[in-house]
């Protein structure tokens, strides 16, 4: 369980040029360093220096690097997990193909809007071997279960019987996670790109284009009914 500090920090070494709360500034600075330099290679002093605070002040907000990493990892998944129930409710009459397409769109949005492309962190060896990653596995498993459950309902019979729901869910998550790779290469994640990724998820389930096209149209309409906010 995360321990959140509520004490005010010490005076800044460098005045802040952002209106974001100090805790958010620490997360933003850490995300930039973890993604570009690596989690293991980044010190709390470097994070504090980037924010413009004393190293001791960082500990008013976090117990250390692992807690910072745990929160960043969660932010790359939690926004999608929190919308799974709403997705299934909205698509109850539209069918599982629409539900799967909509889930993929929401997940793509989460990864595309995540600050500093923090979705990439889950692919770094120094992150996957950290204690913080253990907690992340649990929430990530929730999302994989949702993908697997919905995909099994939508998939062609041969796919549904050949792949266990958990394995199918993991496969689809990996397809969607190409979003982070595209971001790191500088490619824009626009509506057209999101549609290609989401459609690929359905094709991987053996769903023909004759069913993907209406599912995409329905999901694109329904996405406007979701509370879509970028991870902070």
Positions of the model-derived regions?
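C-terminal peripheral helix-coil segments that are non-catalytic and often amphipathic
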Residues: 1-7, 141-156, 181-232
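Arg/Lys-rich, glycine/proline-spaced intrinsically disordered segments
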Residues: 8-13
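Generic hydrophobic, amphipathic alpha-helix propensity
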Residues: 21-31, 47-48, 68, 72-84, ...
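Helix-turn-helix
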Residues: 25, 33-71
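Hydrophobic alpha-helical connector segments
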Residues: 71, 85-113, 117, 172
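Amphipathic alpha-helical packing segments from all-alpha helical-bundle domains
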Residues: 81-84, 121, 130-157, 166-173, ...
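Amphipathic alpha-helical segments used for helix-helix packing
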Residues: 98-99, 110-134, 148, 181, ...
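Cytochrome P450 catalytic-core helices
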Residues: 176
């Amino acid at each position: 369980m995360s321990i959140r500090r509520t004490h005010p920090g010490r005076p800044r070494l460098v005045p802040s040029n952002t209106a974001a709360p100090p805790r958010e500034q620490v997360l933003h600075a850490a995300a930039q360093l973890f993604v570009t330099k690596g989690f293991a290679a980044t010190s709390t002093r470097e994070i504090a220096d980037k924010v413009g605070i004393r190293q001791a002040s960082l500990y008013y907000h976090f117990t250390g690097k692992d807690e910072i990493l745990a929160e960043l990892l969660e932010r790359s998944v939690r926004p999608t997990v929190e919308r799974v129930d709403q997705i299934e409710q909205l698509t109850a009459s539209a069918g599982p193909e629409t539900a799967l397409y909509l889930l993929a769109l929401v997940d793509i949005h989460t990864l595309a809007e995540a600050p500093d492309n923090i979705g990439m962190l889950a692919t770094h060896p120094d992150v996957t071997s950290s204690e913080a990653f253990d907690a992340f596995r649990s929430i990530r498993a929730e999302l994989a279960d949702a993908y697997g459950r919905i995909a099994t309902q939508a998939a062609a019979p041969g796919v549904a019987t050949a792949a266990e729901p958990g394995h199918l869910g993991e496969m689809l998550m990996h397809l969607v996670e190409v979003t982070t790779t595209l971001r790191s290469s500088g490619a824009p994640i626009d509506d057209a790109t999101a549609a290609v990724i989401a459609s690929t998820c359905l094709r991987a389930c053996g769903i023909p284009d004759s069913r993907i096209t209406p599912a995409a149209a329905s999901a694109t309409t329904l996405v406007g009914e979701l509370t879509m906010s970028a991870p902070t």
